Design a protein with these regions (language model features):
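N-terminal Sec-pathway targeting helices
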Residues: 2-11
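Aromatic- and Gly/Pro-rich donor/ligand-binding loops
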Residues: 11-156, 190
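Short, well-ordered alpha-helical microsegments
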Residues: 46, 172-173, 194
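Short, polar loop motifs at secondary-structure junctions
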Residues: 68, 168-172
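Short, structured coil segments at secondary-structure junctions
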Residues: 128, 160, 179-182
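A short beta-strand/loop micro-motif in the catalytic core of glycosyltransferases
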Residues: 161-168
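Helix-loop-beta element that forms the nucleotide-linked donor phosphate-binding surface
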Residues: 172-190
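Hydrophobic alpha-helical positions that pack around
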Residues: 189-191, 195-197
């Protein structure tokens, strides 16, 4: 009887460790493209909230951004896994991640001509064979301000996305009208978690 119990415990431990090992091997890496435009701690909070939620769901997220200030870098390095892009998004390679995701915030507001299409619409990954998502994109204003040229380029880039969502009800109608895509309305990432203060 004791021998059978020892064998049972040994089998249980082997199965348990195999399951843990398999889960580690199958954990999906997500490259999360983040908007960073100067001294904005709000961006860091959104990035941290998304990182926390993705970890909770069993993913292996990496926060990817440009134009970070040193205090933002310190915050993100302390609480997340982050990657700072120095020159341009071509530093990211197709096989590095299983998924790419545009994080929430005003990612569809044209702050930067240099990075607008890469941050908001993953232009650098246009021809990649990878799942691409937009979570909780914001236009940053109530009236549509993108040019016809921006609409054409963005609409073409969004064709290759697996999922598109926005965080403003008004953006649902604007995106439907101008891009011909019906996005899902979602919460801001900071509202997805319960934090103990």
């Amino acid at each position: 009887m004791k021998k059978n119990l020892k064998i049972f415990k040994l089998i249980f431990l082997i199965i348990f460790f195999l399951l843990i090992f398999f889960k580690i091997l199958t954990k999906k890496k997500i490259g999360v493209i983040c908007l960073n435009h100067g001294q904005n701690i709000g961006n860091c909070l959104i990035d941290y909230a998304m990182f926390t939620k993705l970890k909770e769901l069993g993913y292996d997220p990496y926060m990817i951004g440009t134009n970070y200030k040193q205090r933002e870098i310190n915050f993100l390095k302390k609480y997340t896994k982050c990657r700072i892009i120095k020159n341009n998004f071509s530093e990211i390679k197709e096989k590095e991640y299983d998924y790419l995701m545009v994080n929430s915030d005003q990612t569809w507001r044209k702050f930067s001509k240099r990075y607008f299409y890469d941050i908001g619409f993953l232009k650098f990954a246009k021809n990649w064979n990878i799942h691409k998502f937009v979570y909780g994109a914001s236009l940053g204003y109530s009236k549509w301000k993108l040019t016809k040229k921006d609409e054409i380029i963005a609409k073409d880039l969004l064709k290759n996305f697996t999922g598109i969502s926005v965080r403003e009800i008004g953006a649902v109608n604007s995106v439907s009208k101008h891009f011909g895509i019906k996005p899902i309305f979602v919460l801001d990432p900071t509202l997805l978690n319960i934090f103990n203060l």
